[in-house]
Amino acid sequence: MIYFEVDTEELSHAIRGLNIPKSKLNSILKTAVNRTARQAKTWLPEEAEDRYHIKRRGQVKKGLKMTGAKISSPVAHIISSGHANDLYDFNVTSRRYSPGNRPPSGHKANVLRANSPVALMLKPNAGRDKYRAFVVKYKSNHIALAQRIPGKKMEGNSKKEAIRNLYSISTPAMLGYEKGVMAKVSPKTEALLASEVAKGIERYLKL
């Protein structure tokens, strides 16, 4: 969860001489906080895309829910929901689903743009495709990266080993990573919030 608020006690002390009623000040803060939070909902997916090889930025934004500030409580919350993302949602080579023509060297993937692609193989130098990752397409038409599970048989076909999808970082973890996405978004939201509060006070004083 990401939240936005203003230190009302410190602000009240700073503007004591302006004689702004507390109810009006809280109204100014509510507007400023909500405008900042709405902008942050746009910045977060953008910064995530800059840092990660995420293929579906729209899904990241869709998973963000905002609880707006109120006059009685000028605090806004942005909540990110979602489970681990399919590794296929990030940078994968090759992305092609072709069971009869898989890449001889296997598939590679990377999640962070700063990192180089890594070969997806459970056992180094595994013969053929047995323990290499491969692109799979389910009856629902969902496409993912998967690998065989050594020693576990597939239900309904004991001659084959079972498969499991490969996952990566969840969207909440991606957005809340303090050295990554939030490290870039926080300074911008702090500056915007201060600016919006100042604009609100200026508008009031001009009445």
Protein language model features and the residues they cover:
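Short, Lys/Arg-rich flexible segments
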Residues: 1-207
